[in-house]
Amino acid sequence: MLKKLSNGFNPCAKNRKIENGKWKMENGEHTMNDQPNSQLSTVNSPLIPPGYKLTEVGVIPGDWDIIKCKDLCEKIQDGTHFSPKLGGNDYLYITSKNIRYGNIDLKNIERIDTFQHKAIYKRCDVRYGDLLLTKDGANTGNATLNNLQEEFSLLSSVAFLRFDSKKNDAHYFLQQILSKQGQQQIKEAMSGNAITRLTLEKINKLTFPVPNLPEQRAIAAALSDVDELIAKLDQIIAKKRDIKQAAMQELLTGKTRLPMRMENGELKMDNAGNPVRFSGDWEVKRLGDLFAFSGGFTASRDQLSESGYCYLHYGDIHKSGKSYIDIDAEYINIPKLAIELNRINSSALLKDGDVVFVDASEDEEGTSKHIVVINPNNRPYISGLHTIVAKCKTDDLNNEFKRFCFQTRNIKEQFRFFAAGTKVSGISKTNIAKIELYFPSKPEQTAIAAVLSDTDAEIAAFEARREKTKLIKQGMMQELLTGRIRLIENGKLKREN
């Protein structure tokens, strides 16, 4: 199914096919526009395909129904509206921060004592298999199924939906809620509210296209298969990142020395036939001896657009999953600032090999966030608000080595030591200059950077595969959850050849 859908396969296309986002009959007549929110107007409606009907949520199969959440569920309830005292280590206390897209995150879970839990659970008795939906805050609309066998308490920021299992499959409705159409419906339900919130009343009124139970299960199974593939890719990526982190800790501290290579790329061997490894002591210098530091040009996010000169906002450094930015490769996606270049101090214009640090972070881990600029063609690139630009004063460091050398545990601990502030951690140019960096000879820097770059390339390949799989799933959701592709025929599961 995954392979066929990725190639545009449509198992229901006996007398119609999808062409340019529209259904086309064999006689060439287009029948239905593929509208993103599936809200088709009853005014001037196009011809409805045979076996389909027009409803308030769009065109769906004739044997499907449109049903509100309150009529699908045995119970819909949110958690406690009174914050309990944390501690006691008896029962898990789950809030919206623990509900992710399709899973429960227990990394930073809190616990409460038995007395408080019993009082909460009496009203909000969430069970295994219930659907958990965030209803407050920035994560509103995130949902997952409860896969925990133990009792736990919920905060009011999360509601649970208990579907009638004799008629409805919770896995199917999880996919409906997480779909583009489901998220749009939630967004519209929250419109007009000063605070981002989804009330129980609004949840009860959420409306979904509903096939019979066998087809619900077939659709949920097909989409769950893709979810499993995405989860496996996530695991591989996480493992690769752990391997990279361990390799950096070994290679960037000199604990492990790499074998040397000759100019032709072959390993250098000693007389006994063993690889010759790099040796010798590493240098240590303060960053102030290696770099000249300066600030960026202040401009708000609102001033940025798609025209002008490339502009590096400190928020984009925080959000980046990389330690470098390639101007030529990423030019289209880099925000621009429309400004006369002579208004920008030359120290704020980023050159190839410059390192840019953030000077403020909401958490300690973010205080060492940085990127290395790859700009061989010297495109104008402006370093922005809350950035500290580091320009080399010496040729001690390779540009490729810079991408990794600031990611060691030792460097991060020094950043945390010099950072100041409570809610927001900040670091000054003066304090960054005091940080000490250990580094090897330039040939060894090159060898280290090559090994770590290869690992980065592997991670990037898996990330690209994951993103492609996610796009395929989005296409599957659009087709399966609206009935454009049917997995059930004459009441029986279709079998692929």
Give the positions of each predicted feature:
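Amphipathic alpha-helical segments
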Residues: 1-9, 57, 62-66, 173, ...
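A short beta-sheet element
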Residues: 95-96, 112-178, 313-315, 330-407
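Low-complexity, Lys/Gly-biased intrinsically disordered segments
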Residues: 63-104, 121, 140, 284-326, ...
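Non-catalytic DNA-recognition/assembly elements of restriction-modification systems
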Residues: 17, 26-28, 49-78, 205, ...
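Short, solvent-exposed loop/turn positions at domain surfaces
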Residues: 54, 60, 80-81, 119-120, ...
